[in-house]
From Swiss-Prot:
Source organism: Mycobacterium leprae (strain TN)
This protein's domain notes: Forms a U-shaped beta-half-barrel with a small hydrophobic cavity able to hold a triacylated lipid or triacylglyceride. A flexible lid region may move to accommodate different TAG molecules.
Name under which the protein is recorded: Lipoarabinomannan carrier protein LprG
Known function: Helps membrane protein ML0556 (P55) transport triacylglycerides (TAG) across the inner cell membrane into the periplasm and probably ultimately to the outer membrane. Binds TAG in its hydrophobic cavity and transfers it between lipid bilayers. TAG probably regulates lipid metabolism and growth regulation and plays a structural role in the outer membrane. Binds di- and triacylated phosphatidyl-myo-inositol mannosides (PIMs), and glycolipid lipoglycan modulins lipoarabinomannan (LAM) and lipomannan (LM), facilitating their recognition by TLR2.
GO molecular function terms noted in the UniProt entry: lipid binding
Gene that specifies this protein: lprG
Length: 238
């Protein structure tokens, strides 16, 4: 059945982050990390930008710290692929009328499905009418664009992200790039951000946090399973 319009508006926000994942993934420093010289920040951000432009699937963990107007998502978990077709699935905790709501979601065949009631799937119509879930992997509007517009890069140290050593780099992201990937921020000037880039392999983007210093809010996304297959089953609508 088709979901009510007020629920569609709610999931317009949920779908903007359809590319995300489950438990809040943090980072930790440890003595097992390399103690060698830190790499050049600008070079590594450029390498991560080039790699991210070609990523077609990923597992993401998203967490929102604080309250952001128009963004009732607290945590979101899921997998996304844009090749050969765009599909996504996951789970989110959202705040509705002051209460936390846990919902599963699926995007398949261009349709957005979700469970606002446990085990009861509803069809929210065309995902593209609510939000283009593929945008986070869009090289012109997603994470690659954020990295391409990352300025003032400075290496800060090393942390462990999902058990992998990553170099922590601080800088700023242009307002336009922020608003493309996180419209509720309504950025009017560059925003402080921190990226964690894997120290081994292809130097994949392992984590990013965008901070709104004026409000004290932030959005953090942690990535893994780059370019691994994603399988999604179309749910049975109640």
């Amino acid at each position: 059945m088709q979901a009510p319009k007020h629920h569609r508006r709610l999931f317009a926000v949920l779908a903007t982050l359809n590319t995300a994942t489950a438990v809040i993934a943090g980072c930790s420093s440890g003595s097992n990390l390399s103690s060698g010289p830190l790499p050049d920040a600008t070079t590594w951000v450029k390498q991560a930008t080039d790699i991210t432009k070609n990523v077609t699937s990923a597992h993401l963990v998203l967490s929102v710290n604080g309250k952001i107007t128009g963004l009732p998502v607290k945590t979101l978990t899921g997998d996304l692929t844009t090749h050969p077709n765009t599909v996504a699935s996951g789970n989110a905790t959202i705040t509705l009328d002051g209460a936390d709501l846990n919902a599963n979601f699926v995007v398949v065949d261009g349709e957005l499905y979700a469970t606002l009631t446990p085990s009861k799937w509803s069809d929210f119509g065309k995902a593209s009418d609510i939000y283009d879930v593929a945008s986070i992997l869009n090289p012109d509007a997603g994470l690659a664009n954020v990295l391409a517009n990352f300025t003032g890069a400075k290496t800060e140290g090393r942390d462990s992200i999902n058990g992998q050593s990553a170099v922590r780099i601080s800088g700023n992201v242009s307002a336009d790039a922020v608003n493309k990937i996180a419209p509720p921020f309504n950025a009017t000037q560059p925003m402080p951000a921190t990226v964690w880039i894997q120290e081994t392999g292809d130097h994949q983007l392992a984590q990013i946090r965008i901070d709104n210093k004026s409000s004290g809010n932030s959005v953090q996304m942690t990535l893994s399973n780059w370019d691994e297959p994603v399988q999604v089953t179309k749910p049975q609508v109640s």
